UniProtKB/Swiss-Prot annotation:
Polar residues: bias regions: 110-128, 490-499, 531-548, 1397-1406
Keywords from the named record: Autophagy, Cytoplasm, Glycosyltransferase, Lipid biosynthesis, Lipid metabolism, Membrane, Protein transport, Repeat, Steroid biosynthesis, Steroid metabolism, Sterol biosynthesis, Sterol metabolism, Transferase, Transport
Domain PH intervals: 286-385
One of the GO BP terms on file: sterol biosynthetic process
Reactions catalysed: a sterol + UDP-alpha-D-glucose = a sterol 3-beta-D-glucoside + UDP + H(+); ergosterol + UDP-alpha-D-glucose = ergosteryl 3-beta-D-glucoside + UDP + H(+)
Top EC class, one word: transferase
Top-level taxonomy: Eukaryota, Fungi, Dikarya, Ascomycota, Pezizomycotina
Annotated compartments: Cytoplasm; Preautophagosomal structure membrane
Stretch list, region Disordered: 83-231, 457-558, 576-622, 1334-1406
SMART domains: GRAM, PH
Domain-related comment: The GRAM and PH domains are required for the localization of ATG26 to the preautophagosomal structure (PAS) and are involved in autophagy.
Originating organism: Aspergillus clavatus (strain ATCC 1007 / CBS 513.65 / DSM 816 / NCTC 3887 / NRRL 1 / QM 1276 / 107)
This protein's name: Sterol 3-beta-glucosyltransferase
Family: Belongs to the glycosyltransferase 28 family.
Length: 1406
């Protein structure tokens, strides 16, 4: 891939100074900053410190930030805090797969002549564009080569000068190298053949253009007695199936080719051929199916339960579905042979067991039901079929004259199926059988085909099956070009002849014919001897096959003209297994595609002259000699070949035996690496045991070039390891079942910290970060896509003398690595950052590699051009198109979509309950406006001071008691858990809670649905009493996860998943203990409900709506289905706002002076020295040379009316405002500086500008850490001139930060958070109703004040109603997963609560 061509050179250059570089992706290097921004004497001073006696964040509770919610948790009187962990509450959920959508492709149809221009581009321009890296790209990628017409040129391109005999232009090479193929024969159901190869017909340079591109899917029959033989459809079929001339299309049907699965496509009947075409687009990064299965061990008959995910060509399984980066193992379906249900052990019962066979072993699985087992088998069969298919489309073609007979073969009640038997060719006498199923017009098709066969038989009565019979010129050409390849489930074997002739063949009883693109051929396979069956007994891993394994692949095409039906049943490629790889070209494939045998290509032109070779043998003979050999071989092929199965191994051993004495060690290494037992013991690494172990423990690092060899300036490599043929990249890809397009870039030895330090090896490739444990007895593997990595940070190690590296991942807990030396750690960090920058902006099309994207485009173009030709025929001949309803109807099986309309039929009365500041109310106004538009009747219940604002938007209002300003004053002025805080809060707070609960109960009457911020505390109990569905909504993380810490417990440094999870457990328990007494008394006296506990409430089962962007806080992998991150709920009040004239003039003047503009506003905060903070802001703005719009709100006491006044005069660079809508203001500035509240952060990020956050309390620390992790801003721990001026300069000059912020802003603006939230409400409404009913049945009493309480209780089961300890429990699997996560979190962090309360986490951990 082009972006990585110079990675090796850049990496070497940068690695030399790695230890001196800054590692933050969002910050500029110190060397880039001007000298004036170096730290001064005030670098450690914080001018935002609160007044004396209150203390700073460091002086008080370091983690429980100053907020109303923390205050609530702190002042519950007579609460037994020592017992806060005696009661537990479960959190569970399952992982939802994320898919990437495939972007539409149109560029391949851009030329005026789609046929010729595309042909020339693929053969000429793309050939020159490919790097030499493609020469070594073998294995899996060529299997995916699809209809991009690469058959017009050799797939292997080179930047080296061409030999004199090679045509200099792409057109000449096209004409000389590629003689035409007339037609193709097809399959028969034989046992195992190695793999399916593509053969796509070449395009003639004189072929007329097809014109426009059309997308149509039509599935019935077309009859045309007037159709011209040169119609667009005839021409297109001639090009695709390589006929001699355009053949008149007699009829067209929508049908399915029946093999292990129904392959839906089209049958075209021409004058001389029957053709079948199917388009099979693939998306390799989409999870096809996932779920729980039981897997049997290799030796242990016991079944163990795992979470399985089928993605691309790999079936992976995981012990924990929330840890999808750490697979327990995988089954590589590229080596798959079959997937089938096991035989039922009981008569009359369908089996739940099934098995998957590969070329190495058979895997046994058990599903939870027989239906599930069938679904898995069907999905696996599709994947195995795709891996056998050489691209994104399948073609089958055979001459009508070769048809023996056609007979009906009833298989399905709803379709007509018949079998066509075809003689493969005139030499082999092989007979193939094809089954075609017609869902419409089947009887008509059968009659027509039988009549054609009968007419052909009567017209050619002299035709025989004898290979010695007279044949027409076309027949002769067909004979010479048909069986150019024989493929086997084993490997290629040399033919019978001297080594000088370079004759290689692959042994098989089955033939797959390549199209004209598949240039390498094996001429000695024209005739097959019965002794060839001996060759089939060679296993892939044996010496005879491994020695002569050749991985030169031929030119590829996008689709296949298949020969013989057994191609559907053999493995695509064969395991690298315990043998030395030849080099990168070996991949894990056998001759010809794995199985492509490589040597010389014998192509016969029409006049019988030998064609030009496409690929050299291993020795690479010159043109002239190869031509001579080809000519000789072409002469030999007129008679039967004489394969010698014993010769290959003997010749190889003789050759090895003639090595000089100094090469004896190499021969011994050759034998040693082929020992299966030793290879298993040494983890398939082909190096000596002593060297392996010593190198492993010494550690270090290695970088690899384009050919995946160690760069010369890296650490010395063992000479024997160099001479050993096995490529480093091959072993890397074999370890993790990765495609051949994944190139190894660097490796490091390090410790992965999870529960215990685990020593292993880090692999960095173009798109993956992988880890493999090296400790005996451990099998930990990690595969992490770099696109999921947000940032990389250097930290101190957990152990003395070690250096730490933290990987921050989207929606997942952080990963910690430890290195022995700082050099290795710094080098790894720099390498990762280089790859992150490359990967971050690569277009994600849903495909694994750029080659696959090109190939998919070409296959799609071929499909569209064929559809276009059909439409052209319709226009010319007035033939009705295929009936849309005649063929197979697609089955709706997309788990991410739904055909069900979840919107309630009637209008709902929806109440939104919240408390707090203006920022807590604003999102609900936006949501209620959306609900009004949907026809519902929303109401907001909050503090009375917000009533005018709410009613101005046409939303109903209900008051809730409590003064938010007084609560905020207690939090801000007293700090957290100080003596003055506890004293004042205990005096005022308890009465406030009683008033809040009672007023909330009154405000929520007459509601059908309740949506509440969990800070309001009353909603879940009110919904239980009213028997109505209940949702939660909030602006910060409140649900348990290992990905992020609780918003009120953000640590100074990353602490990992165990810490993150335990913060939620702690806060839930402490918060509930503080209010439990008052809440239960209120439930009994006013709601008529029984007392409850945290476990009985099951708050983690409640549907939750988070109103921030999934691009800012990606959904964690361990969130259950009912927790949804919807996007911001913006109100957009600035649309009609008119700015003051002086503000507009200030902005205009700054633009004219070419100065950057920043906004600075921290809200209403309390600081010890307001004038010092003002001077700091002024000096920082002047030092950074920017213009500032200032919104001042700080003072030495909360609510001070003079807080907006400046203590010192403001310079002309600063313009002060009182208020302005954020959505308007942030669009006018280049950067924003604020306190980091959820709403303000969302507004600045939506504007697409870098954001600087100075957090003070609450969730502000969480959002500060998020913008820094995303690389779109800076979070300042202290505020002084040195730090602030540098941050202002970076935010306005760092192109990396500016681009990232701009891209993030575009993503946020594309979201519609309100609409997504409303759809989520509809979707989860039934789930919420179920929860409400279950809770009300369990907790209602005869004194319940709600009219429906008794009736509902009577409907419930008496046992459940009377149960005091009833607890709603969901799916067992869910609960098991929750329990495992909780147990792991608690065991991982036994002492963490004490550390949390003693301010010593960082010191104890590092």
């Amino acid at each position: 891939m082009r972006p990585f061509l110079d990675d090796a050179k850049r990496r070497v250059d940068r690695r030399l100074s790695a230890s001196k570089q800054s590692i933050s992706t969002s910050r500029l290097l110190p060397s880039v900053l001007p000298d004036r921004f170096k730290d001064n004497h005030d670098a450690q001073v914080d001018f935002t410190a609160p007044p004396g006696g209150v203390g700073s964040r460091e002086g008080h509770m370091q983690y429980m930030q100053q907020s109303i919610f923390s205050m609530i948790a702190a002042v519950g009187s007579r609460s037994d805090f020592h017992a806060r962990f005696d009661e537990s509450s479960d959190s569970d959920g399952e992982t939802e797969g994320r898919s990437q959508t495939e972007s539409p492709v149109k560029k391949v149809l851009g030329s005026s002549n789609p046929v010729n221009s595309q042909t020339e581009q693929r053969s000429g321009s793309q050939t020159s564009r490919k790097s030499e890296k493609d020469q070594s790209s073998r294995g899996r990628h060529h299997r995916r080569t699809i209809s991009d017409h690469k058959f017009l040129r050799p797939f292997k391109t080179s930047s080296k000068p061409e030999p004199d005999t090679e045509p200099s232009t792409g057109d000449e090479r096209l004409r000389v190298t590629l003689p035409r193929r007339p037609r193709s024969t097809t399959p028969r159901a034989a046992p195992i053949l190695s793999r399916m190869v593509e053969a796509q017909a070449q395009f003639d340079s004189k072929t007329p253009s097809a014109g426009r591109s059309q997308n149509s899917s039509q599935e019935s029959s077309i009859h045309s007695s007037h159709e011209s033989s040169t119609s667009p459809l005839s021409t297109r079929l001639m090009e695709m199936f390589d006929f001699n001339k355009p053949e008149k299309v007699l009829v067209e049907y929508a049908c399915s080719l029946l093999q292990s699965m129904l392959l839906q496509g089209y049958m075209y009947v021409t004058e001389g051929h029957i053709c079948f075409y199917a388009y099979l687009p693939r998306k390799s990064t989409v999870a096809i199916k996932s779920g729980y299965l039981h897997k049997r061990g290799r030796k242990n008959p016991k079944y163990n339960r795992y979470w399985f995910s089928l993605k691309g060509d790999v079936l992976s399984y995981y012990a924990d579905p929330s840890n999808l980066y750490f697979p327990s193992g995988h089954v590589d379906l590229r080596y798959g042979i079959s997937a089938s249900l096991a035989e039922s052990k009981e008569k009359g019962r369908e089996p739940k067991e099934f098995q998957v066979s590969t070329d190495q072993r058979t895997y046994h699985f058990r599903a939870d039901s027989s239906v599930s087992a069938k679904e898995w088998v069907k999905a696996l069969q599709k994947v195995i079929f795709r891996t056998h298919n050489e691209g994104d489309s399948v073609k089958v073609s055979f001459p009508i004259e070769n048809i023996i007979d056609i007979e009906e073969s009833p298989m399905m009640d709803f379709a007509d199926t018949f079998k066509i038997r075809v003689v493969e060719d005139d030499d082999s006498y092989a007979i193939d059988e094809y089954f075609f199923s017609f869902f419409d017009s089947g009887r008509e098709a059968l009659t027509l085909l039988k009549s054609l066969v009968n007419e052909n038989a009567s017209g050619h009565s002299s035709r025989t099956l004898s290979p010695h019979a007279d044949r027409s010129p076309r027949s002769d050409r067909t004979r010479r070009s048909r069986n150019r390849w024989s493929l086997t489930s084993g490997t290629s074997q040399p033919g019978n002849g001297s080594a000088d002739t370079h004759r290689k063949r692959s042994a098989s009883t089955s033939h797959l014919s390549l199209g004209p693109d598949a240039i390498p051929t094996s001429p000695v396979t024209r005739h097959q001897d019965p002794s060839e069956s001996i060759l089939n007994s060679f296993e892939q891993g044996t010496e005879s096959s491994a020695v002569w394994q050749s991985m030169e692949d031929g030119a590829e095409s996008a689709s296949q003209i298949l020969h013989r039906s057994d191609v559907f049943q053999s493995p695509t490629i064969h395991n690298l297994d315990k043998r030395a790889c030849s080099d990168e070209r070996s991949g894990r494939r056998q001759a010809g595609g794995t199985a492509r045998s490589t040597l010389t290509h014998v192509n016969a032109n029409k006049d019988g002259s030998p064609g030009e070779y496409s690929k050299l043998g291993n020795d690479g003979k010159p043109d002239r000699e190869i031509r001579h050999v080809i000519h000789e071989l072409d002469q030999e092929t007129q008679g039967p070949s004489k394969p010698g199965p014993g010769a290959p191994t003997l010749n190889e051993l003789v050759k090895a035996g003639t090595y000089p004495l100094q090469r004896a060690a190499g021969f011994a290494e050759y034998l040693r690496t082929r020992s299966k037992q030793m290879s298993n013991l040494l983890a398939s690494e082909s190096m000596g045991y002593i060297e392996k172990v010593s190198g492993m423990w010494v550690g270090g690092r290695r970088h690899y070039g384009e050919a995946e060899d160690v760069l010369p300036d890296d650490q010395a490599v063992d000479p024997e390891d160099k001479e050993d043929g096995c490529n480093y990249g091959d072993r890397f890809r074999a370890h993790f079942a990765l495609p051949s397009t994944e190139k190894l870039q660097a490796t490091y030895f390090a410790y992965l910290h999870r529960v215990l330090p685990l020593y292993g090896k880090i692999y960095i490739s173009q798109k993956k970060l992988c880890f493999r444990s090296l400790i005996p007895g451990t099998r930990t593997k990690m595969i992490l896509p770099l696109k999921d990595v947000e940032n990389v940070e250097k930290e101190k190690g957990f152990r003395f003398g070690y250096q730490g590296l933290v990987i921050i991942i989207r929606g997942h807990e952080e990963l910690f690595f430890e290195f022995r030396t700082s050099d290795a750690r710094d080098d790894c960090a720099v390498t990762l950052h280089q790859h992150l920058e490359s990967v971050k902006y690569l277009a994600e099309s849903g495909l694994l590699a750029e080659q696959e994207k090109d190939e998919s485009e070409a296959a799609m173009a071929e499909h569209r051009m064929l559809q276009e030709a059909r439409l052209d025929d319709y226009g010319e001949n007035d033939i009705p198109p295929l009936n849309e309803s005649s063929g197979l109807h697609p089955i709706f099986d997309d788990p991410r979509a739904s055909i069900v309309n979840f919107k309630p039929a009637e209008s709902l009365r929806i109440t939104c309950l919240t408390i707090g500041s203006r920022g807590d109310v604003q999102p609900y106004i936006a949501l209620c406006k959306g609900l009004l538009a949907e026809g519902h009747k929303p109401k907001i219940a909050t503090h009375a001071e917000f009533e005018p604002w709410v009613r101005r938007h046409g939303i109903d209002f209900a008051p809730v008691d409590g003064d938010p300003a007084e609560l905020m004053r207690i939090c801000v002025e007293n700090g957290m858990f100080t003596y003055s805080f506890l004293k004042e809060a205990s005096q005022k707070f308890r009465g406030w809670i009683d008033d809040l609960l009672s007023s909330a109960w009154a405000s929520c009457q007459d509601s059908d649905l309740l949506i509440e911020s969990p800070s309001a505390m009353a909603g879940i109990h009110i919904a239980e009493a009213l028997r109505i569905p209940y949702f939660r909504a909030f602006t910060m993380p409140w649900s348990r996860t290992r990905a992020y810490p609780h918003a009120f417990a953000v640590p100074e440094h990353k602490m990992g998943g165990a810490y993150n999870y335990i913060t939620y457990v702690m806060f839930d328990n402490v918060f509930w203990k503080a209010i439990a007494g008052q809440v239960n008394r209120w439930r009994k006296n006013e709601l008529g409900l029984k007392a409850t506990t945290l476990d009985k409430m099951q708050p983690n089962k409640v549907p939750f709506l988070y109103n921030y962007s999934p691009s800012v806080v990606p959904p964690p992998l361990d969130y259950p289905d009912w927790i949804r991150i919807t996007g911001y709920w913006f109100l957009n009040e600035g649309v009609d706002w008119t700015p003051p004239v002086d503000l507009s003039a200030f902005i205009q003047r700054a633009r004219e002076d070419d100065k950057k503009i920043v906004y600075i506003g921290f809200g209403s905060i309390v600081v010890s020295d307001p004038s010092a903070l003002t001077r700091t802001v002024i000096e920082s703005v002047q030092k950074a040379d920017v213009r500032c719009i200032l919104s001042k709100g700080w003072s030495d006491r909360l609510g001070d009316p003079s807080s907006a006044k400046t203590e010192v005069p403001l310079p002309p660079e600063i313009f002060q405002i009182q208020a302005a809508p954020h959505d308007w203001l942030f669009a006018q500035v280049d950067a924003a500086v604020h306190h980091g509240g959820a709403g303000t952060t969302g507004a600045s990020l939506r504007a697409g500008i870098p954001t600087i956050i100075k957090p003070f309390f609450g969730d502000q620390f969480f959002f500060g850490s998020r913008i820094e992790d995303l690389g779109v801003g800076i979070c300042m721990k202290k505020l002084n001139v040195s730090v602030f001026s540098r941050a202002l300069w970076e935010a306005t000059h760092s192109e990396r930060m500016i681009i990232r912020a701009r891209d993030l802003g575009a993503k946020i603006r594309d979201e519609d958070g309100v609409a997504t939230a409303i759809q989520a409400i509809y979707r989860d409404l039934e789930h919420a109703k179920t929860l409400a009913q279950q809770r009300s049945i369990a907790s209602s009493t005869p004194f319940s004040p709600t009219p429906s309480a008794k009736n509902t209780a009577e409907q419930g089961d008496d046992d459940v109603e009377d149960s005091e300890e009833w607890t709603f429990v969901g799916d067992d699997n869910e609960m098991d997963m929750s329990r495992r996560m909780r147990d792991r979190a608690i065991s991982d962090a036994e002492m963490l609560p004490d550390r949390l309360l003693t301010n010593s986490i960082h010191g104890a951990g590092r």
